[in-house]
Each structure stands twice: as C-alpha cells, then as structure tokens.
Amino acid sequence: MPGTRVAVVGGSIAGCAAALALYRTGHHDITVHERTSGELSARGVGVAVHEGRYTELAAAGYLDPAMTHIKLRGRHWYVRSPDSGPAAPLGRLIRTESFDFRTYNWGPLWRELRARVPAGVRFRPGSAVTAAAETSDGALLTTADGTTDRYDLIVGADGYRSVVRAAVHPGLRPAYAGYLAWRGAYPEDRLPDGALWDPASAAYVVFPGGHVVLYRIPGDRGGRRVNWVLYTAPPPGPGLPLDSPGGPPPGRVGTVLREHLAALTAAHFPPFWRRVIDLTEPGELFVQPMYDALASPGVTRRIALIGDAATVARPHTGAGAVKALQDATLLEAALRDGAALPDALSAYDSAREALGRTMVGLGRSLGTALVTGAPDWRTLDDAALAAWWRAADAAGAFGGTRTPERTEPPRDT
C-alpha cells in the first residue's frame, strides 16, 4: 500500500489527523483538498477533551502537553431560583462534581495539528470537492473547477455536510434532532465579576427545555476566552430551514433567533449567567442545528470516511474532536497491519463504527435528558441530579470511550 496516491477531502482537525495517519504508514503522495480559502485557524470556539482520552491520544502522537490548554477540575450545576438576585447571582447550586477535561481553542489546536503534517503533504485551499466515486481500479475526485483526478484512496474528512459520504453511503442524510445549539466565545476581560466563576469550573446552567455549558478556553494569541454552548428548541415560525444540513450559515444569526435567545435568558437565567450570554456580540454568535448520523458501512474498497463525515453525534457527548482523532488512530493502526487496502479499510470501519454507534446513542440519550425531555430542574437536589445523570449516561461514555489498544507505538514523522 505505501506509495499509493491518496486524497484527503477536508483540511480541518479530522483532515490533518488523517493526513498524519496516512503519512506515518508510508503513504507520502497525499493531497488535502480544503474547500475554504480563508484561514481555518480563525475559528475560535471551544474544544473539550477528557483527560483519559487525552492520555491515549498523546501516547498515539496526536496531542501533547505543549498544546495550549486549560485544565478543568469541576462541573457545577446551577438553576435559577426565586432568590437568584444580587445575593445569589449564580443561582442555586444543585451539584458539584469532578470534571477532568482539558479545553482548547479550535484555531490554535488546528494550527498545532497542521504543523505536525509533514511538508511533503500537498494542501490545496479553495479546492471544493463536488463528487467522489469508486471505479474498478481506483477512485475519482471532482472539484468545482471541473477537474477530475484519479486516486488509489480517498479519505472523506469533510464534516457533517460531507460530499464524499454520498459515494460510500448513498441516501444517508443527517437527521435533524429538533433543536439548536447557540454558540458564542469572546475575550475573558469583557466578563464582569469574573472572580465569581472559577476558571477551572465548567458551569451547566439548566432551564426549562434546555441548558447551557460554559467554560474558559485559551485565547488565540494568549489570555483566555469565555466559551458557551446553549441547547434548546428554536422559536416556532417560518423562515428557519433547520431541518436541512444547509441551515443558517455560522455567524449569520437573524433577528428572530437573537430575540428568542435574549428572551430566554431574561426569563430563565440567574443574573450572572444572563450577563455572560448577553455580552456576546452579534459577530461572535452562531447557531448550529443538531443532527444524528452514522455511516454504516463507512468505507468502500477505495474510500473511507473519518470524523463527522462518518459519525455525526450531538456535542452533548463531550467528544467531538476526540472522535475525529480516535478515527485517525484507528485508520493508522489498520493501515499499519500490511493487509490489502480493502481489508485494511474494513478493519478500520469495524472499530470506528463501534465507537461511533456508542457516541450517536449517547448524544441522543443526553439530548432527551437535557433538552427534549428535561426534568423540572427546580425539583432536583444533589442526589436526584446524580441519579438522573447516571441514567442519562448509562454506558459511562461521556467524554468518549477508550480507543482499542494499539499494537505498536507511533512512528516518527
């Protein structure tokens, strides 16, 4: 297999990890097609990685301690109560628990992974792929300029709107879950009374029909940023094409959604957390419809899917970036074994599909527990919330599950 001509579609975290995995297994003729021509590192949202998964990914050579991060140690659950005011600006604390995660800024994390990809790998920004297809002796990739190139292997790392997925699993479309994630991030120095909120704490603020997760992430060039993700149903009414993967573009949140968010925080948030959300500027706010999808199979004889192209799990799982990096380690391990390419891809898919199915199931379970079937949070105390969480994450998979053991250490690049 080494020496084959390979295309990676998508140049973000999954694409960089895939290119690194391929290069380590002797595939040095690699072209990465990235549809955007802008600077990917400008994306400034948060990424959280469970400490256990970090240890595995660091051992595999995909993460390391030098990558700028913030360590979280606790998770604090808050709900608005009748006395949530100046004397209790954070609201009623329902529960405090251990929360061993590292948080990253997507942009710097991507830069670190991009820097690990050997210089011999060709990156083509602004190369939008429009179609992929398998042939009897290879695979074809067509780009927006009308060019069609032949490769021995295509790896689809092009996200939840994947074009490559259609060549592997025709007709599979991510299913809309019925609600949204509002996201925002901004410099920490904008935060008033920041001392009220421990930088090592992830806050879960719950309200009727949803919740928001808030934590700090590293700044793009130093300092820290406030990062938050709020999950709830959109307001009723026309003009919101949220049942399609082509929903509202990031960064273009219309008046209806902004007003709905403001009304929600005013009605249901303790004062401090409402202020945290309200300080987000329009250009820092975007909306992400929630979807589920699992490509099974996720490979053909010459094409493989990785990351969100293969598995779309809701972010409640706390394992989005982890899943992409785990897929890369599994692809690397399968290609190392020296089997024929179709057999190697089949072995990769078996391991990937098992992890992906677990994450999709967890995302659905947590989506029901936290959003569409959320309890009356006001009635829960510490013990009741602990029992509720154990039921919601019955498999104990929050933050990702353990990657199957590698048979040998990663090779130097």
Question: Where do the PLM segments sit?
Answer:
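Conserved Rossmann-like nucleotide-cofactor binding loop
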Residues: 14, 38, 161
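C-terminal helical "tail/cap" subdomain of flavin- and related membrane-associated enzymes
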Residues: 2-3, 65-70, 87, 299, ...
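Glycine-rich FAD pyrophosphate-binding loop
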Residues: 23-43
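Conserved FAD-binding catalytic core of PHBH/FMO-like flavoproteins
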Residues: 83, 100, 110-267
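FAD/FMN-dependent oxidoreductases across multiple families
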Residues: 216-220, 232-317
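Conserved mid-domain beta->alpha element of the FAD-binding
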Residues: 7-25, 155-156, 280-365
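Residues at the starts of beta-strands that form the adenosine-phosphate
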Residues: 5, 28-31, 225
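Active-site-adjacent segment of FAD-dependent monooxygenases/related oxidoreductases
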Residues: 38-116
